[in-house]
Amino acid sequence: KMNETAVSGISVSGAHEGNLQIPEGIKKTVCPDGLPERFKDVAGGMGSDMDMLVKESSAGAVLLSADSDVSGEPARIRFAYGAFEHSLNTFGILAKEGSNMTVIMDMAAERSVDPERTGSPSPVGENPAAVSQSEHTGLSAVQTKLILEKDAKVTLVQIIRNKNAKTVLNDIGAKVADGAKLSVIHLFLGGDRVYNGCKAELIGKKSNFTADIAYTVADDCVLDMNYVALHEGKK
């Protein structure tokens, strides 16, 4: 449940097979059992129900970490979702003290049934171009948890344009330490029912969080957004 909206009957079949382009200076770690213990108390904007969904999915996680300024070359994560796919992906972003990194996530609908395309295969005989949006039953869920250590900077860009999804769940949770800065940029361009929750805990002195949001919502579609900045540190 988020805001006054309750989403029920959610189930996932595993993680979506995205295309990750990770530049030098950012370390990628696959975590089959989920994110490391230090991420457990990072609360997301969609609440504990999303954490439970992640736990029940047993889909594992991917951790991206940096310990220097690598902002000149972003990490890019591209998704190409099918019309009947039910998937969940979990990402952790660890920006160590003094580091600077940018992560771009492009969550799109698949364009063809080319076997060389990025993403999970479609059911046999499915041609996404021939499937009307009213027939789509797909669900795409992404949870991203971030830890920014002292004086770290992270820019997280998420482009949500998955017209193949009946339901889109996007969850962000962050802990921001002394002098650290988190910038979230959101572009919402597609999806039948899109639910987005973002929570940043500013636990350090002069910690900072900004969110820049742009969106288009078609007739009869839903975009439910929730952004929380919890300031616990000193000014």
What are these language model-derived features?
Residues K1-V62, D69:
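Long, low-complexity, mixed-charge
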Residues V42-E116, A129, S134-K235:
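Conserved beta-strand/loop scaffold segments within soluble protein domains that form the structured core
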